[in-house]
């Protein structure tokens, strides 16, 4: 009831009382977990209700008291993880709803509490990543919906939390890529959908974080290419989907981000040309797709950006660049769409 009515002081008092050494041995772990996970008549736990109702004071009180409570009563990481993984009656994770609905303030409270919980309760990397990948009953991740719906604040909170989490658990570059490219039931990634729908706030948030991700998690060129292309499960790039949907700002942002960060990522002239000549499963490049669909402005943008990068990176004499440049210019002289090669 205290949680239900938002009485943070009472909640804190109860949790702190359960943490007193006098309670140790009086309550079994099973009974303690029963108290912590007490549900209302609809099957919602107190933590689920507090988070769902955006009661930041109650949630903060619970999370602040949890490390001592777990230590006093010798709760193991699986029990703490189970408590944090509060679900509704349809087994949808509470953090799924937080991310899907764009409640960045609540997500930040939970993620800020994780480093201490990792240290004191020994949460594993797999458990922490599972919280970040919180899903609904059908297996759709909340982060995916946040990206699809343009909730850039959710993306920003997660990206900003990753370095501090990495200090506690061994999060690798591949773990981060896997998290950021998590897929829906339709096997599309959130970034793919953000590009398709033109959610510039999400895309800019992602690309602005790339230097930090690169330096913190030692990303390699392969990791970076995955994020720039944002492929779905059919290896169809989000960049190409953006072209199909005339999202010129998205296309420009992707190529500018590549231009801005290529040196940091150690991209060579060949790497840059690989990206420019990357083909969808249907065997056409981004430029060819734009031209075939009659999006001449986007096609010209792609050519102009390539020319600028060739000058900036000093590979204007590269045979691949010269051949591609000539091919693009020849196509653009044609009055009607050209069948892609």
Describe the residue ranges of each PLM region.
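Ankyrin repeat boundary/linker residues
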Residues: 39-40, 87-89, 135-136, 181-184, ...
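Non-Sec secretion/translocation targeting segments of pathogen effectors
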Residues: 333, 337-341
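Ankyrin repeat domain, specifically the short helix-to-loop turn at the C-terminus of the second helix
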Residues: 15-21, 26-34, 63-70, 75-82, ...
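Conserved ankyrin/ankyrin-like repeat signature
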Residues: 10, 58, 105-106, 153-154, ...
């Amino acid at each position: 009831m205290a949680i239900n009515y938002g009485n943070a002081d009472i909640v804190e008092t109860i949790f702190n009382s359960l943490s007193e050494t006098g309670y140790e041995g009086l309550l079994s772990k099973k009974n303690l977990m029963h108290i912590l996970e007490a549900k209302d008549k609809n099957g919602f736990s107190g933590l689920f209700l507090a988070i769902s109702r955006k009661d930041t004071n109650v949630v903060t009180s619970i999370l602040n008291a949890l490390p001592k409570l777990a230590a006093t009563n010798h709760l193991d990481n699986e029990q703490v993880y189970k408590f944090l993984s509060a679900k509704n009656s349809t087994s949808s994770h509470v953090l799924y709803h937080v991310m899907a609905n764009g409640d960045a303030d609540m997500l930040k409270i939970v993620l800020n509490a994780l480093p201490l919980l990792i240290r004191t309760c020994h949460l594993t990397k797999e458990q922490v990543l599972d919280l970040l990948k919180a899903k609904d009953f059908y297996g759709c991740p909340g982060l995916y919906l946040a990206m699809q719906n343009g909730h850039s604040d959710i993306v920003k909170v997660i990206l900003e939390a990753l370095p501090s989490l990495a200090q506690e658990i061994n999060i690798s570059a591949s773990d981060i890529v896997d998290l950021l490219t998590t897929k829906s039931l339709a096997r599309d990634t959130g970034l793919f959908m953000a590009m398709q729908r033109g959610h510039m706030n999400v895309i800019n948030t992602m690309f602005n974080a790339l230097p930090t991700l690169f330096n913190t998690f030692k990303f390699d060129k392969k990791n970076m290419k995955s994020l720039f292309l944002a492929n779905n499960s059919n290896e169809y790039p989000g960049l190409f989907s953006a072209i199909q949907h005339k999202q010129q700002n998205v296309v420009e942002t992707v190529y500018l981000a590549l231009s801005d960060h290529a040196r940091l990522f150690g991209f060579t002239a060949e790497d840059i040309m690989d990206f420019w000549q990357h083909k969808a499963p249907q065997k056409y490049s981004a430029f060819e797709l734009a031209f075939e669909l009659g999006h001449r402005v986007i096609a010209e943008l792609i050519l102009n950006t390539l020319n600028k990068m060739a000058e900036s990176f000093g590979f204007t004499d590269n045979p691949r660049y010269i051949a591609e440049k000539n091919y693009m210019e020849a196509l653009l002289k044609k009055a009607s769409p050209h069948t892609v090669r």
